[in-house]
Design a protein with these regions (language model features):
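Residues immediately flanking
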Residues: 39-41, 103-104, 141, 279, ...
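A residue-level signal for conserved active-site and pocket-lining positions in enzyme catalytic cores
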Residues: 38, 100, 140, 187, ...
Length: 728
């Protein structure tokens, strides 16, 4: 039975339909209401061990004035009936009704067999951004917000998200308590609250962008348009865009993301008194003060040194011979290089007989700092361009956001503009590095296909874009400059650096003089931009509510770690205090002063599991946080069990099934799905590549025998020397 509710009261279908007819519509025939959709599902294996998934409740939320209407049911036939009701009441066809779904890709796998799709738009398979079905449009609210539902509710102050016990096997025939139904309705209520705010902010629902970076693009374009002639600005941008497939492909292959790596000589060791430095707003900082390449031209590959000395921006395809890391830091990524006989450090190259890669002049500078090269490299392709600052109004659009984010933080009554500035400045990077040439993603009868775009046609379309205001090479250089800033500082500190990630460094010893000199250089560069473009100092040096100057792009000092241990990129744990194993009260509640960051594992799940196991084995969680630990057992390795990991393995199925099933209460009913997703909780373990494992064993033997030392000021402890950070 389909149920209709107004807030918490059950109403008739007739009363709901009356409200549908009263919904305002824009001149472009879009209904101006916030509407959301969600389903709850159960996964199980049948008696033959086959994977199954079934929907046991679906729900819509619909906002009218200050009221929220809900519709929910238990079967797909009921859902199809409601879709027909919506089509009829809203007279869909030329008129459009937008319904938001958080993580549309999941719901899409269930609903595509229950309705005819007229259009599907996706950037990659299984991740539709929106789908259309004769006037009914489903959009993904996750792509728009870039938040999980729980974080969206917390950040925006919406209704708090509650969790059902998903381990319970529920079917469409399972009686649901009022509390369980309430949990289901909260999810769609959060999205309706969010979309109501977005409609208010944008004016109409059709003006809401598809993704979070769409807001950043719109903001920057509007800012530029309000300060200069946009046609003249865009003409200058079009003049410098890559105009040949060779140049574009060279740029695309030279693009590299953030640098994250652990010093192999510190990997697996509990370090004490670790200093933490953060490079504030890394990407906006380099965009506002660094110079970027403008129009590229092809150049003589034998003249690389000449162009470097002239201070030109350079793109190149280059081969290095006999390349070998000078220190414990390996910076070149194996997957970005073609190599012969490489020695690898967790995906980073220590040495190679021959190495071919596509890089910028900034990468070339860093490579020469961190590697020795046996003989002169061979440059195969070379393009050069002049370095200039980004256009003033593009810089100012970013600085305005930084100023707002800094000055409005914690100001009572300014929470909304602060959050908007924060979200926009966080999207500036994504906006700048978006690849303008996208493959076409097709969906046919349950199968996703990728059709590569024609580069020549794509570049022509890119050049003619009405909303163009950045050049693709600028995005390539944004990450190149950010890596250069990070690695240049790492190079100066040396082997005291334990770990670095994008815009942060964890190191032994304070190295105050190095960070101070880096900050002096950065402030000098900021001043040069201010003088060049006549920019007021307050934009680079805004003040917080406490009247403290917060200069853009400086290295800031974060609280010191009392203990820190890394097992490689995106794998580390730490505590701020000696007595981390004693629960203490903080603003976040009562908890242990022990924290964990592991890619693919929730911080809360990983921490709770380690604490639980440390109590079981009566050892420190720092000891448990390892690939293997023979002190506990000969085959122990850190593993978070399925019930604690919060991770699931998802499989997508397009084969229909119909079978008898039994729920957790013993109720039997026939379940039927034409397409579905099966999700199964899985354990999480700290795996390690055999090559990396052998490397670490070699390093540890060298440390234990005194063969390797970080530098003249640092003596690494011998492995097993002392039981650091043990529970007392």
């Amino acid at each position: 039975m389909v149920t209709y509710k107004l807030n918490n009261e059950i109403i008739s279908e007739h009363d709901f339909c009356l409200k549908c007819r009263q919904t305002p519509i824009s001149g472009k025939n879009y209904y101006q209401c916030a509407m959301s959709f969600d389903i709850e599902t159960t996964s199980y294996r049948n008696n033959h061990g086959e994977k199954r998934g079934t929907m046991y409740i679906w729900q819509f939320a619909f906002s009218y004035d200050n009221d929220i209407y809900y519709i929910y049911g238990r079967t797909w036939k009921e859902w199809e009936y409601v879709i027909r009701v919506l089509r009829y009441q809203f007279e869909l066809g030329k008129k459009k009704l937008i319904i938001y779904v958080h993580n549309l890709g999941f719901e899409f796998q269930w609903i595509y067999t229950h309705m005819y799709m007229t259009k599907i738009f996706a950037r990659k398979p299984r991740h539709p951004i929106y789908i259309e079905s004769n006037g009914l449009i489903f959009r993904c609210s996750y792509f728009l917000s870039n938040y999980s539902l729980r974080n969206l509710a917390r950040e925006r102050g919406y209704t708090s998200k509650e969790e059902l016990d998903y381990s319970i096997k529920r079917l469409w025939c399972t009686p649901l308590t009022d509390e369980e139904i309430s949990y289901c309705l909260v999810d769609v209520k959060i999205i309706v609250e969010y979309i109501k705010d977005e409609i208010k902010k944008n004016g109409t629902i059709e003006d809401i962008p598809l993704t979070s970076t769409g807001y950043a693009r719109r903001y920057c374009l509007e800012y530029i348009s309000s300060h200069e002639n946009i046609q003249s600005y865009q003409a200058k941008i079009r003049d410098i865009l890559p105009d040949t497939p060779e140049l574009f492909n060279l740029m695309n292959e030279a693009y590299t993301g953030a640098f994250t790596h652990a010093n192999r000589n510190h990997t697996g060791i509990v370090e004490e008194n670790v200093y933490c430095k953060d490079y504030t707003s890394s990407y906006p900082a380099v965009m506002t003060r660094k110079r970027f390449p403008y129009r590229f031209r092809k150049a003589d590959p034998t003249k690389l040194s000449t162009y470097i000395l002239r201070g030109k921006a350079v793109l190149m395809k280059i081969t290095f011979y006999g390349i070998n890391a000078k220190s414990n830091h390996s910076i070149l990524s194996l997957h970005k290089c073609a190599t012969e006989n490489p020695k690898v450090d967790n995906g980073r190259i220590i040495s190679a007989d021959e190495l071919t890669t596509n890089i910028t002049d900034l990468d070339y500078d860093i490579i020469n700092k961190f590697y020795s090269i046996k003989r002169k490299p061979k440059v195969h392709i070379l393009y050069v361009a002049d370095y200039r600052y980004l256009p003033k109004n593009l810089i100012m659009s970013i600085l305005e956001l930084y100023k707002m984010k800094t000055t409005l933080k914690d100001v009572i009554g300014k929470e909304e503009p602060y959050l908007r500035a924060k979200e926009l400045i966080n999207s500036v990077y994504g906006m700048s590095v978006t690849n303008p040439l996208n493959d076409e993603i097709m969906f046919n009868y349950g199968e996703w296909d990728t059709i590569p775009t024609d580069t020549t046609e794509g570049l022509e379309k890119y050049r003619k874009g009405r909303k163009i205001f950045t050049a693709y090479q600028w995005g390539v250089w944004v990450t190149a400059w950010a890596r250069w800033e990070l690695l240049n500082t790492v190079y100066r500190i040396g082997n005291d650096v334990i770990y670095c990630d994008t815009d942060s460094i964890k190191c032994l010893n304070e190295h105050k003089e190095i960070f101070d000199s880096e900050n002096e250089r950065i402030m000098k560069e900021n001043k040069e931009v201010m003088e060049y473009y006549d920019i007021d100092e307050e934009f680079f040096n805004p003040k917080t509510i406490e009247n403290k100057v917060k200069t853009l792009g400086l290295w800031d000092t974060e609280p010191m770690y009392r203990y820190f241990k890394t097992l490689g990129a995106k794998r580390y744990c730490f505590s701020y205090e000696d007595d981390y194993f004693i629960k203490k009260q903080s603003k976040l509640g009562t908890d242990y002063n022990f924290f964990i960051t592991v890619a693919g594992l929730s911080k809360e799940s990983g921490k709770n599991s380690l604490i639980k196991q440390s109590l079981k084995y009566n050892v420190s969680p720092f000891d448990l946080f390892d690939f293997e630990n023979t002190n506990i057992s000969n085959n122990y390795c850190m593993e978070v069990p399925p019930e604690d990991s919060g991770k699931s393995a998802f499989s997508y199925h397009s084969t229909a099934f119909k079978e008898l099933a039994v729920d957790y209460l013993g109720n039997k009913c026939t379940v039927e799905e034409s397409s579905f997703v099966h999700a199964e909780p899985i354990a999480f373990s700290l795996s390690i590549a055999e090559q990396y494992k052998l490397l670490l064993k070699t390093v540890r033997v060298d440390i234990a025998t005194g063969g390797i030392c970080s530098n003249k000021n640092t003596k690494l402890r011998k492995v097993g020397d002392k039981n650091w950070a043990k529970r007392s």
